[in-house]
């Protein structure tokens, strides 16, 4: 299989000047111009906000956008003091996982999939939206609907990817709702690990202890965990496979 899970127009290289107001980042691009880019990741981005860091941004000519530039990637010093590119656009994570599903890479874990729906209302009050609702093929032994929640994961310690990197009430609610779907449906949590320098995934207990508790309760109740790892380049993202869970 070609490990290029998705390809795109080459990104523009630049230098991070600062990130501010959560949604904005000033970046100096190769021609010396300073542009303001949209930052889709509004969290603390632990270990990623080093002023002067190399970054990559994309450009959109859409007239509907307030800002034509989007911050996509940042280069950091990762494991073994080696440089690694990290994908920081949280909106891109769902595109990656959809590609994984469409390329049948979840077959051994979820079986054959007949239909993919995005942003489907679910939960007791139907006010939450699941990232993907999968309908299995009729040939599958388990014909339950599959609810998939994706979490963009950038924070690491040593060789372990961690989510979340801050307290997340929304994430806590998602775990409660995923657990509530069991056993009538399958619940799946997919950490989308947007850097290659890791070997394991674990809940970010240090940042959100309650999330860690709810995570363990959901796993015990039957929620499936499928951490997916990717390597980021200037014109494509490569598939690096599944990573195991590591709990203390």
From Swiss-Prot:
Coiled-coil segments, which residues? none
**InterPro entries registered for this protein in UniProt:** SfsA, SfsA_C, SfsA_N
Q: Name one GO molecular function term.
A: DNA binding
CDD domains registered for this protein in UniProt: SfsA-like_bacterial
Tell me which family the UniProt entry assigns to this protein. Answer: Belongs to the SfsA family.
Q: What is this protein called?
A: Sugar fermentation stimulation protein homolog
């Amino acid at each position: 299989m070609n490990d290029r899970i998705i390809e795109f127009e080459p990104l523009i290289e630049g230098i991070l000047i600062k990130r501010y107001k959560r949604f904005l980042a000033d970046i100096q691009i190769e021609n010396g111009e300073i542009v303001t880019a949209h930052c889709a990741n509004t969290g603390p981005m632990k270990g990623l906000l080093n002023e002067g860091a190399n970054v990559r941004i994309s450009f959109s000519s859409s007239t509907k956008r307030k800002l034509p530039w989007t911050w996509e990637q940042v280069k950091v010093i990762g494991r073994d003091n080696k440089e690694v590119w990290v994908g920081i656009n949280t909106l891109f994570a769902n595109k990656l996982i959809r590609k994984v599903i469409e390329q049948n890479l979840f077959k051994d874990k979820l079986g054959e999939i007949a239909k993919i729906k995005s942003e489907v209302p679910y939960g007791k009050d139907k006010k939450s939206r699941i990232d993907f609702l999968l309908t299995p093929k009729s040939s599958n032994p388990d014909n339950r609907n599959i609810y998939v929640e994706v979490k963009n994961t950038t924070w690491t310690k040593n060789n372990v990817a961690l989510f979340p990197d801050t307290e997340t009430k929304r994430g806590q609610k998602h775990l409660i709702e995923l657990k509530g779907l069991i056993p009538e449906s399958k619940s799946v949590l997919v950490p989308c690990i947007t850097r290659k320098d890791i070997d394991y995934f674990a809940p970010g207990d240090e940042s959100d202890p309650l999330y860690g508790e709810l995570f363990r309760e959901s796993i015990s109740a039957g929620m499936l965990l499928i951490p997916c790892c990717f390597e980021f380049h200037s014109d494509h993202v490569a598939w690096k496979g599944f990573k195991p869970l590591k709990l203390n």
